[in-house]
Amino acid sequence: MVGKALGLEFNKKIINTLKGEQMNPDFIKINPQHSIPTLVDNGFTIWESRAILVYLVEKYGKDDALYPKDIQKQAVINQRLYFDMALMYPTLANYYYKAFTTGQFGSEEDYKKVQETFDFLNTFLEGQDYVAGDQYTVADIAILANVSNFDVVGFDISKYPNVARWYDHVKKITPGWEENWAGALDVKKRIEEKQNAAK
């Protein structure tokens, strides 16, 4: 979605981690951590989606709207990006993505961590329109991607009114939302297939 916001086109190569394609020696040469996404930009390689987002807006942004130069604004954006990486994505993986391999969602304790994560996000959004303050930034885009995955697998976002308000707004203004949602629907389909096979 950041690429769309910046008007960039990518030469995408799909790596199927469920089939272990990330362990291909050619991919490991590019990224020894064998994680996705990975960006190769004119010979420069970087991975971890939030690091990629910041790199792209710093290099290709026409202005600093998505990642302001103001150090305090950057600090809040970075905190939200780290929150997304350290809490939001792991709770998604631990509760919902377990179904990719087992056909079963995670434990009740895992679900409580999902709720706690959304409580934090709801608090961040109290009295403001965007996750890192008064303007739309890369933090909104990163967190939108994860919130959409929670949404598609049935997590009740409406219990978190600030998150629900933000989500309804940000998905309307984010370039590439439709492609992101299509990916989220694919996640849902794969989880449902695994759940049906486990019955």
UniProtKB/Swiss-Prot annotation:
<feature type="binding site">
    <location>
        <begin position="48"/>
        <end position="50"/>
    </location>
    <ligand>
        <name>glutathione</name>
    </ligand>
</feature>
<dbReference type="InterPro" id="IPR036249">
    <property type="entry name" value="Thioredoxin-like_sf"/>
</dbReference>
<comment type="similarity">
    <text>Belongs to the GST superfamily. Delta family.</text>
</comment>
<feature type="binding site">
    <location>
        <begin position="34"/>
        <end position="36"/>
    </location>
    <ligand>
        <name>glutathione</name>
    </ligand>
</feature>
<dbReference type="Pfam" id="PF02798">
    <property type="entry name" value="GST_N"/>
</dbReference>
<dbReference type="Pfam" id="PF13410">
    <property type="entry name" value="GST_C_2"/>
</dbReference>
<protein>
    <recommendedName>
        <fullName>Inactive glutathione S-transferase D3</fullName>
    </recommendedName>
</protein>
<feature type="domain" description="GST N-terminal">
    <location>
        <begin position="1"/>
        <end position="64"/>
    </location>
</feature>
<dbReference type="InterPro" id="IPR010987">
    <property type="entry name" value="Glutathione-S-Trfase_C-like"/>
</dbReference>
<dbReference type="GO" id="GO:0005737">
    <property type="term" value="C:cytoplasm"/>
</dbReference>
<feature type="domain" description="GST C-terminal">
    <location>
        <begin position="70"/>
        <end position="199"/>
    </location>
</feature>
<dbReference type="InterPro" id="IPR004045">
    <property type="entry name" value="Glutathione_S-Trfase_N"/>
</dbReference>
<dbReference type="InterPro" id="IPR036282">
    <property type="entry name" value="Glutathione-S-Trfase_C_sf"/>
</dbReference>
<comment type="subunit">
    <text>Homodimer.</text>
</comment>
<dbReference type="InterPro" id="IPR040079">
    <property type="entry name" value="Glutathione_S-Trfase"/>
</dbReference>
<dbReference type="GO" id="GO:0006749">
    <property type="term" value="P:glutathione metabolic process"/>
</dbReference>
<comment type="function">
    <text>Has no glutathione S-transferase activity.</text>
</comment>
